[in-house]
């Protein structure tokens, strides 16, 4: 992925649950890759570089692509901004930066990203102190909870699920 992202001159990161699980020493087989550019094209070029040339499944409605490599499912997406209408769960999507993409994440612990380019490989991008929340076992939204939950009310259920699965507390402000 690093080689292809560098060839394409795309800033690329692994983000979300896979990064969280690295720091929690938990196994994870789902990898989310976000790139500042075309995630579908990146997935197709990565597949072309792999020995077994895995099939790339493209989900145009979501602007994502997924491939299976060994026992991993790797999903690729372009960094984006999302906004929601109050009467719909379907977001309006625009291209964005890594910071925009992190802003749209459900919780600080899922907004963690690691650089995948040669110049930033393994460098943590953590604008919301998600590492501190991991250490303190706290579930917190990266933005105001009213914004995060009104964008997608199912995130409330995800907070409860993560709290139960990980043994974390939901932050007071997030609960309100």
Cite the ranges covered by each PLM segment:
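Catalytic cores of the polymerase beta-like nucleotidyltransferase superfamily
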Residues: 1-176
């Amino acid at each position: 992925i690093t080689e292809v992202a560098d060839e394409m001159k795309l800033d690329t990161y692994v983000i979300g649950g896979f990064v969280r699980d690295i720091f929690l020493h938990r196994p994870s087989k789902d990898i989310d890759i976000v790139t500042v550019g075309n995630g579908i094209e990146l997935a197709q070029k990565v597949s072309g570089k792999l020995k077994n040339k895995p099939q790339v499944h493209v989900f145009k409605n979501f602007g994502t692509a997924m491939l299976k490599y060994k026992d991993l499912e790797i999903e690729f997406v372009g960094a984006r901004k999302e906004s929601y209408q109050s009467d719909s769960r379907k977001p309006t999507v625009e291209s964005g930066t890594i910071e925009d993409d992190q802003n749209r994440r459900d919780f600080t612990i899922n907004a963690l990203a690691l650089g995948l380019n040669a110049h930033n490989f393994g460098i943590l991008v953590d604008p919301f102190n998600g590492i501190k929340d991991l250490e303190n076992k706290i579930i917190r939204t990266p933005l105001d909870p009213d914004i995060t939950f009104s964008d997608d009310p199912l995130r409330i259920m995800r907070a409860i699920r993560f709290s139960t699965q990980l043994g974390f507390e939901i932050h007071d402000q997030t609960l309100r």
